[in-house]
Design a protein with these regions (language model features):
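Glycine-centered short loops/turns at secondary-structure junctions
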Residues: 28, 107-108, 187, 218, ...
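Alpha-helical recognition/docking segments in bacterial nutrient-uptake
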Residues: 1-15, 19, 76-181, 185, ...
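Flexible loop/turn connectors
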Residues: 242-351
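Hinge/beta->alpha junction and helix N-cap segments in small-molecule ligand-binding domains
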Residues: 86-95, 114-122, 168-178, 194-244, ...
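Short acidic capping loops at alpha-helix termini that bridge into adjacent secondary structure
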Residues: 190, 221-225, 277-284
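Generic beta-sheet signal
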Residues: 141, 156-158, 170, 194, ...
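N-terminal helix-turn-helix DNA-binding module of bacterial transcription factors
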Residues: 1-77
Length: 351
């Protein structure tokens, strides 16, 4: 089909694919500026955050797609990165991947995703396997990197800090404060806690934050009201099992603060099966704000991690590292902030 025919087809379908020239003209900036934003080197040239956001928004609006094949042939680079996740299912990893994809595709990068399913041998083997595919960098999502690698590495929620790895982390103290102060205002004093799985990088950091904030605001943590998600099981099942254990202990509680939304949804299911009404008798708070949190019955009160933002920051940071020959990389973790989402799974404690 000729170019003229392609334009006509685009108008007919309503899909217009803009190139670098069209983007630059639309924004009133140079093609060089647009290119530097899209290939992740904006900060090297001190391009303002406002301009970066305008370029990314316009690229999405105008359906810009970088010609990755042509670029890679010219530069003799793979234009690919690797992404390691614990598992691919609804929730944390999927949301982070969405943010990573937003940035990489606009920048003309392709990515390989591998799921280690918490198997230590796969955690060790996957970095080498990905490097054998000529990836230029690696993003590890809730996955500990056990050795230094010869390529740039960005970690999302890996609290085992390594000098050569840039970490994207949530402010867990602020997250714990949001949840516990909310329950405290609702006069909850007997709070049950469902901790994360032993393999999760966030488990210890989040629990330490909870203990610190609880001590500050005068909430006493009863050890018999603390349980932990089992390392096996998928979806809501670990949360269901943890809540069954809490009920079997026979210790009264008026609220549950769960490690994640899937655990909280599992807890609500078990409470309902036991004839306990949420939130009239027991309030439940989750963590993450996954898609099903808002559609659950009742809609879940939760601490929202900006998961897609964390993915976008991770991908943007990795691209900057790939393009930065001087290795002038951040020396400290990049911290993102949570927000609190109050829905219908919490209410005042029954005195």
């Amino acid at each position: 089909m000729t170019s003229k025919g392609s334009d006509a087809a685009s108008r007919k379908t309503g899909v217009v694919k803009a190139g670098l020239k069209e983007l630059a003209h639309y924004l009133g900036v140079s093609q060089t500026t647009v290119s530097r934003v899209l290939n992740g080197s904006a900060k090297d040239y001190r391009i303002s955050e406002e301009t970066q956001q305008r370029v990314l928004a316009a690229a999405a609006k105008l359906n810009y797609k970088a010609n990755a094949l042509a670029r890679s042939l010219r530069s003799k680079r793979s234009k690919t990165v690797g992404v390691m996740v614990p598992e691919i299912s609804e929730g944390y990893s999927t949301a982070v991947l969405g943010g990573i994809e937003d940035v990489l595709l606009l920048s003309g990068f392709f990515y390989f995703v591998v799921s280690h399913r918490h198997r230590s041998e796969l955690l060790r083997e996957y970095p080498s396997l990905l490097m054998s595919r000529a990836v230029e960098g690696l993003i590890a999502v809730d996955s500990a990197i056990e050795e230094d690698l010869p390529i740039p590495v960005v970690a999302v929620s890996d609290h085992h800090h390594r000098p050569a790895v840039i970490n994207i982390e949530l402010d867990h103290l602020l997250a714990a404060r949001y949840a516990l102060e909310h329950l405290n205002r609702l006069r909850h004093r007997e709070i049950a806690f469902i901790k994360g799985q032993s393999f999760s990088s966030d488990t210890l950091a989040r629990w330490r934050a909870i203990c610190k904030v609880a001590a500050e605001i005068g909430i006493e943590i009863n050890p018999r009201l603390v349980t932990q998600l089992e390392d096996h099981g998928l979806g809501t099942e670990p949360g269901r099992a943890a809540t069954v254990r809490l009920l079997e202990r026979g210790v009264h509680f008026t609220a549950i603060f769960a490690f994640n939304d899937l655990a909280a949804i599992g807890a609500i299911t078990v409470l309902r099966e036991a004839g306990i009404r949420v939130p009239e008798q027991v309030s439940v708070v989750g963590f993450d704000d996954i898609l099903s949190a808002g559609t659950n019955n009742p809609p879940l009160t939760t601490v929202r991690q900006p998961l897609q933002e964390m993915g976008r920051v991770a991908a943007s940071t990795l691209l900057q590292m790939i393009h930065d020959d001087k290795k002038d990389w951040p020396k400290h973790p990049i911290r993102v902030l949570p927000t609190f989402v109050e829905r219908q799974s919490t209410a005042a404690a029954v005195q």
